């Protein structure tokens, strides 16, 4: 699930006393989160905290296993599309059940897709279903939701028809296409997925003792899950911990079994907990969105000035200190390779470089174009240590450009930040974006008209034309597709529709008492695959 993420140290980790007993069968796994879970409604969630929870409690047709391979879930097998790659027909398991014991049906998927796309839902995730036939007409209200290219052929047979072939669609199926419990939705209405009393689950766990304002919640094994006998961790307790120092202290005291840390703590943690420190590259981009509705931040030369002022290597090495790496483009390293086997970014031009001379040159141009000597920009961030550190670094770099570049920082809770971004109540900000399928288009869409989270509302005809060419897969080889994507990324580096900052690394502290808990490049760790060591 492509999602908004925290910068630097991300979402995962917990709290409570570790057992010294070797019998861990009833032991609660304790971890932490940096933010609250906002919703477990798969049609509405946009943030990493919510989608980490959803990935544990809701399963779709396919899923990714612990090695990142696509495997069947509610569908009985991985199907081959027909109709020139546009039609997928799935038979569903008869033993897939919701946590109330009722069966998951094809109608639950149809209801979910229609609800996510229809305009009255106002889902920021609607665009993830944009490949389905008649999406545009339904999403704009020109056609009824019943016209969307999805049908329940029978109680346990589902058909999805796309408007065009999509080469990575198995990943979309595994990470974006989730059912909703139709009966629960009819009963609960707008309360669906907003607290644990109104949360439907067909996955390995169900969420308990939770609402969007609570700092603690628990995942409890779902006894109706079709694979429940393979789920070893029976209970997972989460506690919101916003500072890495507190997370480290809790792990040192054995009050938690897993947490995520960042910054200067990483080096010491590696020494103290060598066998329990897990460093993983993560397919997640940190970037600056610019509000294109505002004259100041719409100015290309101002955006270029700040981009050139940011020393991404120094930011990663001296501020984050957690293995994060400088962004080369809007697409993270490792997402995809070109025909020669080289990383995608090897073919991207207009490199993101640090050059104060150029930064000052473009700032002067911005002053002239805006008719202002002093330029004020407020940078919106979430209120965590990692966010604040990155924002303060950017603020200091702006001052190096000119005393007249007045960049101020406003730190607020992530939920409010997302709300302000959605309402365009910002100048610029800091955000993270992750995807769940190995194709650059989801990152390139951060600056396209169809972008799910294009808060900037930035558009450019030349850029959009390339995006449209990328999306026209009918007469396109994989090599041609990658070249078009590299062309788009190169243009975006030049035009700064968004300003890439760095690629996340995740550093987790994980108890030696557990095995099978992995941190993938794409997607989220899955607790159903973890187990206590005997």
Sequence positions of predicted segments:
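Ligand/substrate-recognition segments at binding pockets and active sites
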Residues: 212, 356, 361-435, 450, ...
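Aromatic- and charge-enriched surface segment that lines or borders ligand/interaction sites
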Residues: 76-128, 296
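Ligand-site clamp/hinge motif
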Residues: 224-269
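Detector for C-terminal structural segments
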Residues: 309-339, 385-395, 422-534
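N-terminal lobe/hinge region of extracytoplasmic solute-binding protein
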Residues: 33-81, 200
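Structural transition elements
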Residues: 326-365, 386-388
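Surface-exposed binding/hinge segments that line
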Residues: 125-183
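Gly/Pro-rich hinge or "lid" segments in bacterial periplasmic/extracellular proteins
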Residues: 162-231, 235
């Amino acid at each position: 699930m492509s999602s908004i993420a925290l910068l630097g140290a991300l979402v995962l980790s917990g709290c409570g006393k570790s057992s010294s007993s070797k019998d861990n069968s009833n032991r609660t796994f304790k971890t932490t989160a940096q933010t609250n879970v906002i919703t477990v409604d798969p049609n509405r969630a946009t943030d990493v905290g919510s989608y980490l929870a959803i990935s544990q409690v809701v399963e779709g047709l396919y899923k990714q296993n612990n090695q990142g391979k696509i495997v069947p879930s509610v569908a009985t097998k991985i199907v081959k599309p027909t109709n020139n790659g546009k039609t997928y027909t799935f038979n569903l398991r008869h033993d897939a059940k919701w946590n109330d014991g009722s069966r998951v049906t094809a109608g639950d998927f149809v209801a979910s897709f229609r609800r996510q796309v229809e305009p009255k839902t106002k889902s920021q995730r609607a665009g993830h279903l944009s490949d389905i036939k008649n999406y545009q007409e339904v999403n704009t209200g020109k056609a009824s939701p019943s016209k969307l290219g999805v049908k329940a052929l029978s109680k346990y047979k589902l058909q999805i028809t796309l408007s065009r072939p999509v080469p990575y669609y198995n990943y979309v199926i595994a990470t974006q296409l989730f059912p909703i419990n139709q009966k629960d939705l009819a009963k609960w209405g707008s309360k669906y997925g907003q607290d644990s009393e109104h949360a439907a689950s067909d996955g390995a766990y169900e969420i308990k003792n939770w609402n969007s304002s609570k700092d603690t919640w628990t995942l409890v094994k779902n006894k109706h899950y079709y694979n429940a006998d393979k789920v070893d961790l029976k209970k997972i307790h989460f506690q919101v911990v916003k500072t890495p120092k507190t997370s480290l202290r809790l792990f040192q005291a054995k009050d938690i079994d897993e947490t995520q840390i960042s910054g200067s703590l990483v080096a010491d943690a590696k020494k103290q907990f060598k066998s329990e420190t897990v460093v993983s590259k993560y397919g997640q981009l940190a970037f600056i969105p610019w509000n294109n509705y505002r004259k100041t931040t719409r100015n290309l030369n101002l955006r270029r000035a700040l981009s050139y002022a940011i020393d991404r290597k120094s930011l990663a090495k001296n501020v984050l200190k957690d293995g994060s790496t400088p962004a080369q483009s809007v697409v993270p390293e490792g997402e995809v390779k070109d025909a020669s086997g080289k990383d995608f970014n090897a073919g991207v031009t207009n490199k993101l470089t640090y050059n104060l001379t150029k930064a000052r040159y473009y700032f002067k141009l911005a002053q002239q174009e805006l008719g202002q000597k002093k330029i004020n920009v407020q940078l919106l961030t979430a209120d965590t240590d990692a966010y604040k550190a990155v924002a303060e670094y950017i603020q200091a770099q702006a001052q190096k450009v000119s005393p007249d570049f007045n960049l101020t920082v406003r730190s607020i809770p992530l939920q409010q930040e997302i709300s302000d971004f959605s309402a365009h109540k910002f100048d610029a900000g800091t955000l993270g974006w992750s995807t769940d399928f190995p194709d650059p288009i989801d990152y390139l869409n951060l600056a396209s008209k169809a972008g799910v989270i294009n808060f900037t509302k930035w558009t450019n005809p030349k850029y959009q034309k390339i995006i449209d060419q990328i999306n026209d897969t009918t007469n396109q080889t994989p090599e041609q597709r990658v070249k078009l994507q590299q062309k788009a990324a190169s243009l975006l580096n030049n035009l700064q529709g968004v300003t890439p900052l760095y690629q996340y690394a995740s550093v987790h502290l994980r108890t030696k008492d557990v095995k099978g808990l992995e941190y993938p490049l794409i997607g989220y760790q899955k607790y159903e695959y973890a187990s206590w060591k005997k």
